[in-house]
Curated annotation (Swiss-Prot):
Chain sites annotated for binding Mg(2+): E281, N283
Pfam families: GSH-S_ATP (PF02955), GSH-S_N (PF02951)
GO cellular component, one term: cytoplasm
Protein name (database record): Glutathione synthetase
Keywords per UniProt: ATP-binding, Glutathione biosynthesis, Ligase, Magnesium, Manganese, Metal-binding, Nucleotide-binding
Pathway(s) annotated for this protein in UniProt: Sulfur metabolism; glutathione biosynthesis; glutathione from L-cysteine and L-glutamate: step 2/2
Length: 317
């Protein structure tokens, strides 16, 4: 029997209709795996050995009570076959410390999804810089004058911090926006922080598509997040609405261009954000949208993920 750990935000406060981590655990349970639940404060190092206080959890698809802990124990993380790192951003120093603890278990043979080093290496906004031919025209800088020159050149641009999630602090700045200086000051913290500027992709009105890639294989369906009226952000957290749809040829082309690099880096479960024919983000920390896609189409994305984990465990054995 496979022992699967999961590090996540408190299970008591998830929305089971939308939560991808819950979907993953349900699939693991269906396979008879033993699921060890952890939060960040359950991870420790003791003389270089990764230790975890875990709770074995049973799940049911019931909005009145979706989980029950059946036992609690302190174990070496390496006793688990695999661990899903599903803690939501912020990607802060605490998150980074947790990846080091997970890496110690990885060195003893535990499969960590996604690979700790790659979680540190692949910032969700910046990692797209490795695929410039697929992205909107982009600069990353702290300097206000560079951002202003970029806007001068391109007219309609998007400004965003490198560490936001759910559409937080994303600004659209048009040609004669009187607020441009204060937006730049806010985002760069008066030149102390890097910010990203990108050309605006008008196709956002048709949705910001979330494409899931499992162990190098793009899933054939995506969730298009349509911005609320008058909004430029499709994120569900910013009031967008989700519309599951099959991948277009362009979507598939973009996903196939990125997928081999993801697989090679041990990024087994990744969410690509695509607007029109442009890649805007590569989400590696805890991508979501499984539930919405699985509800609309005859596909088990979680099944494919657990198959990939089984394959990798067999290859390691």
């Amino acid at each position: 029997m496979i022992k699967l750990g999961i590090v996540m935000d408190p299970i008591s406060s998830i929305n089971i209709k939308k939560d991808s981590s819950f979907a993953m655990m349900l699939e693991a349970q269906r396979r008879g795996w033993e699921i060890h639940y952890m939060e960040m404060n359950d991870l420790h190092l003791d003389q270089g050995i990764a230790i975890a206080d875990t709770k074995v959890v049973q799940l049911k698809e019931d909005p009145n009570g979706w989980y029950e802990f059946t036992s609690e124990q302190t174990i070496e993380l390496a006793e688990l076959d695999a661990v899903l790192m599903r803690k939501d951003p912020p990607f802060d120093t605490e998150y980074i410390y947790a990846t080091y603890i997970l890496e110690r278990a990885e060195e003893q043979g535990t499969l960590i999804v996604n690979k700790p080093q790659s979680l540190r290496d692949c910032n969700e906004k910046l990692f797209t810089a490795w695929f410039p031919e697929l992205t909107p025209t982009t600069i990353v800088t702290r300097k206000a004058e560079k951002i202003k020159a970029f806007r001068q050149e391109h007219g309609d641009i998007i400004l965003k911090p490198l560490d936001g999630m759910g559409g937080a602090s994303i600004f659209r700045v048009k040609e004669n926006d009187p607020n441009v200086s204060v937006i730049i000051e806010t985002l760069t913290n008066h030149g102390q922080n890097y910010a990203m500027a990108q050309t605006f992709v008008p196709d956002i009105s048709n949705g910001d598509k979330r494409i899931l890639v499992v162990d190098g294989e793009p899933m054939p369906y995506c969730l298009a997040r349509i911005p609320a009226k008058g909004e430029t952000r499709g994120n569900l957290a910013a009031g967008g609405s989700g519309e599951p749809r099959p991948l277009s040829e362009t979507d598939l082309k973009i996903a196939n261009a990125v997928a081999p690099t993801l697989k090679e880096k041990g990024l087994i479960f990744v969410g690509l954000d695509v607007i029109g024919d442009k890649l805007t983000e590569i989400n590696v920390t805890s991508p979501t949208c499984i539930r919405e896609i699985e509800a609309a189409f005859d596909i088990s994305i979680t099944g494919k993920l657990m198959d990939a984990i089984e394959r990798r465990l067999q290859a390691q054995a």
